[in-house]
Structure formats: C-alpha cells, structure tokens
C-alpha cells in the first residue's frame, strides 16, 4: 500500500503548508501515540523528542507534545540535538520511540518529523502505515488520569558527547591536530566542537551561532566554501562540516580540497582492511563513482549498490551483515559504531583511519580518481515511453563502456524529468554516451 504522508525520510515540507502545520503535527503525534500505546500494553510508553535550530521547531515540538500526551504517552524533550543523538538516546534510555524535528540540509523555511522505533532504528513501513491509518481519525482526549506527562531531560548533550567519544580508539587521541568544525548553525552546534576538543584537538568553531533562521545558510556540508576559507585562514589540518541535523559529513584538507562521502568511506574501509577487521563489504548507491568500486576491490573489499537514499543503504547493510556504507552526499554508516548515519562519529572514524594508515587525507584518496561524469536532465511528457525509446541506444552505450564505465537512468520522483548519468574513464566517452541516450529519450 502506498503511503499518504510519509516520504523516504519521515514527513517533510514547507512550514505553514500541509503537512507541516500545527494542526496536522498535533494529529500526527496523537496517531503515533495511539500506535505506541497499542504496541506497549504493559506500561505507559515514553517517547523522546529532539529538534534542530529552526524557529519553527518550537511550534512543532509543542504540537507533538500535545498529541503524544493526549494519547497517553509520556514525553522527554532534549532541545537541540543531532538526529543520530536522538537515535542513540532512544536506545540508551530504553524508550519506546524517538522523534526528530528537522528538515536536515534544507533551508530554515522547511521542517520535518522523523520517527525512530524502540532501539533507535528507523520505523518500518508497516508501522508508518499504521500511523497513517489513524491520522485522519477523530481525536479523543483520554481522562486526566491516563494522560501522558512531558519533561525536559538534563544532560542529553553530555550523554551523546560521551557516546561519540567512545567510538574513537581508546588508546589514541587527537592531540596535535587543528580542526575547523562547521556545524551549519544546526543541531550539532552545542556538541560537535566539544567532542573533538575533549579528544585533544585544537578546535576552531564556525557555523555555531544559530538564530532560528540561519541553519544551512552558506555553511555546513551542503556549502563548503565557508569551511574551505576558514581552514586556509586558520592553517588547520582539516575541516569538518555537518549538515543541519548532524547526520551528513564533508571534510576539507589543509589545502582547502573537499572530500565527499565516497572518498571518506574509502578511507575508513581501507583502514579497516589494513587492520584485518572483517567489514563484510561496502554498500554504496547507484550514483557511487565506479572508480571507488574498483579501488575498494583492489583493497580486497567487496562492494554493492543500493538505491539512492540512506534508508536503502541501511537495508542492504542489514541484509548482508556488512558494516560500512553511504553516499557521496555525506551520509556514512559505520554499523559497528552506530545504527544510523552520524556526521560526528563518521569524522572520528576518518581521523582514526588516517592514524592507522599513517597518512593524510590527500595521500590516501590519491589511490583513486573519480571517473568523469556527464549528467543530462531530459524533460518528458506524462505517459511517455522513454524506456522503449532509449532501449537500443542504451544497449549500444553500455556495450561500448563495458568494464570502462556505466550508465544510470533515473526518473525524477518530483518533476517530469529523466536523469541520464554516464561515467567513464575518459570524459569524452561519458559525454558522447550521455548525449546519445538523452537524444533518444527526447526524440519522441
């Protein structure tokens, strides 16, 4: 059954526009609370609510609290905390569920609601459908004796900081390193600098003055120019950029070069292989560069591709019992450290890997150079049979690029566009292949 409200990462949209309105979020909290009560009949469920730094977080948090407590669920509120921190505390405190109020890397004018089940794992499709089935039902407030309570928890930041530090090798530290930390004026502003400082690094913090409106604004993992300039200005060893909710990571070296998720995953995987740790393999996506796949296999590390989206990477990791995966966008999963993507923990794993390899980031990543890519968006008409139109040309290009490149065709889920991506060892091969396929699709 198709979901009506939940997308690939919870419920998200522009604040004030359905479904990110106080009345809908009230109903969402109430419906989720009803499902929790049904699943946890032995005791009154407790849910943890965290948020990022958007001005709308206050409004949406109040609506969620009202909905949960009206359904008979207790609520624990953390205030601003990264999404992976909410997942961790949900597990550590043995709570029934966790909720994060955030729109991740989007502008402050958007917001969203993301749920975690018991144990800090993402909700299953089945539970999301259960919640959706109740959203449009009538709200009936329970008798006062059965209502839930709400309270703010103290020390949530400190618990999460200690957890992050525990994922770094106990025999090592970060003394001697100068790091610039860009927290995107987001959820990690109060915790990320402390993690690296307490492990011994000299820390310069930027993007750490949220005002409700400046989250992700010319800062963070989706805008690295500010971090690159700061690394050069402060003559730092590395720069670390998170996104608004702290689950993405980009890094910058001392020369101002940016390293995306693919490069950082390679560093972690190579170090684990060098240490003889069996990670099973690495899960990337259909957009992961082919050169990285080849480089991993040269290190003896298996590789497979999932659909784009960290939930699909996570599903493949769980299915295969592998430990490392992620996307070029900076979602990195280290399953032996945390059960969700975590920008802070991923950065710590990269820094630990560089110590293991006794090399800097540029040297390790020189093992492979990304194959050139050509991407073309082709507009199509509703109902257009673009697969049939491109079938013969696609087969020709794939045969020509066998072992030397690959083709990815993706229909956009939000606009009438087919995205043609061709990558190959040589840029002209990629460009020629993409143009031929795009021409075939657009010829109808």
UniProtKB/Swiss-Prot annotation:
Q: Which domain of life is it from?
A: Bacteria
The record's account of how the chain is modified after translation: Activated by phosphorylation.
Transmembrane spans:
none
* Swiss-Prot/TrEMBL cofactor(s): Mg(2+)
Q: Which residues bind Mg(2+)?
A: 104, 243, 245, 247
A GO cellular component annotated for this chain's UniProt record is: cytosol
- Is Nuclease included in the keywords of this UniProt record? no
The active site annotation covers: 104 (phosphoserine intermediate)
Q: Name one GO biological process term.
A: UDP-N-acetylglucosamine biosynthetic process
Q: Which InterPro entries match?
A: A-D-PHexomutase_a/b/a-I (IPR005844), A-D-PHexomutase_a/b/a-I/II/III (IPR016055), A-D-PHexomutase_a/b/a-II (IPR005845), A-D-PHexomutase_a/b/a-III (IPR005846), A-D-PHexomutase_C (IPR005843), A-D-PHexomutase_C_sf (IPR036900), Alpha-D-phosphohexomutase_SF (IPR005841), GlmM_bact (IPR006352)
Q: Which CDD domains would you find in this protein's record?
A: GlmM
Offer an example of a GO molecular function term for this protein: phosphomannomutase activity
Which family is annotated?
Answer: Belongs to the phosphohexose mutase family.
What's this protein's name? Answer: Phosphoglucosamine mutase
Instruction: Please report the organism this UniProt entry assigns to the protein.
Output: Neisseria meningitidis serogroup C / serotype 2a (strain ATCC 700532 / DSM 15464 / FAM18)
């Amino acid at each position: 059954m198709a979901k009506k409200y939940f997308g690939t990462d919870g419920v998200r949209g522009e604040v004030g526009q359905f479904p990110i309105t106080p009345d809908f979020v009230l109903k969402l909290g109430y419906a989720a609370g009803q499902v929790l009560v049904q699943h946890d009949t032995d005791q009154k469920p407790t849910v943890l609510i965290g948020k990022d730094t958007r001005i709308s977080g206050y409004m949406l948090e109040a609506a969620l609290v009202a909905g949960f407590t009206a359904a008979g669920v207790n609520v624990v509120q953390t205030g601003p905390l990264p999404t992976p921190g909410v997942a961790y505390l949900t597990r550590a405190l043995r709570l029934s569920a966790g909720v994060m109020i955030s729109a991740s890397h989007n502008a402050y004018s958007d917001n969203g609601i993301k749920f975690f089940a018991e144990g800090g794992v993402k909700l299953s499709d089945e539970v999301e459908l259960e919640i959706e089935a109740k959203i449009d039902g009538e709200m009936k407030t329970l008798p006062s004796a059965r209502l839930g309570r709400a309270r703010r928890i103290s020390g949530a930041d400190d618990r999460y900081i200690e957890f992050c530090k525990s994922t770094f090798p106990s025999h090592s530290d970060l003394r001697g390193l100068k790091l610039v930390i860009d927290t995107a004026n987001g959820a990690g502003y109060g915790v990320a600098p402390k993690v690296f400082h307490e492990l011994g690094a000299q820390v310069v913090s930027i993007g750490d003055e949220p005002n409700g409106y400046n989250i992700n604004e010319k800062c963070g993992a989706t805008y690295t120019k500010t971090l690159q300039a700061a690394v050069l200005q402060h003559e730092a060893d590395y720069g670390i950029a998170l996104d608004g909710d702290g689950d993405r990571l980009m890094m910058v070296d001392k020369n101002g070069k940016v390293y995306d998720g693919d490069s950082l995953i390679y560093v972690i995987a190579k170090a684990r292989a060098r240490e003889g740790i069996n990670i099973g393999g690495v899960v990337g996506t259909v957009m992961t560069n082919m050169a990285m796949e080849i480089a991993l296999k040269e290190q003896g590390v298996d590789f497979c591709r999932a659909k784009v989206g960290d939930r699909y990477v996570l599903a493949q990791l769980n299915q295969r019992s592998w430990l490392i995966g992620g996307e070029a966008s900076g979602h990195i999963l280290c399953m032996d450290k945390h059960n969700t993507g975590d920008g802070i923990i991923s950065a710590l794993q990269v820094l630990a890997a560089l110590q293991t390899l006794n090399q800097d980031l540029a040297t390790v990543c020189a093992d492979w150079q990304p194959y050139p890519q050509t991407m073309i968006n082709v507009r199509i008409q509703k109902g257009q049979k673009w697969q049939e139109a491109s079938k013969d040309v696609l087969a020709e290009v794939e045969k020509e690029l066998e072992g030397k490149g690959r083709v990815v065709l993706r229909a956009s889920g939000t606009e009438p566009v087919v995205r043609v991506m061709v990558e190959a060892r040589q840029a002209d091969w990629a460009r020629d292949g993409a143009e031929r396929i795009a021409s075939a699709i657009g010829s109808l």
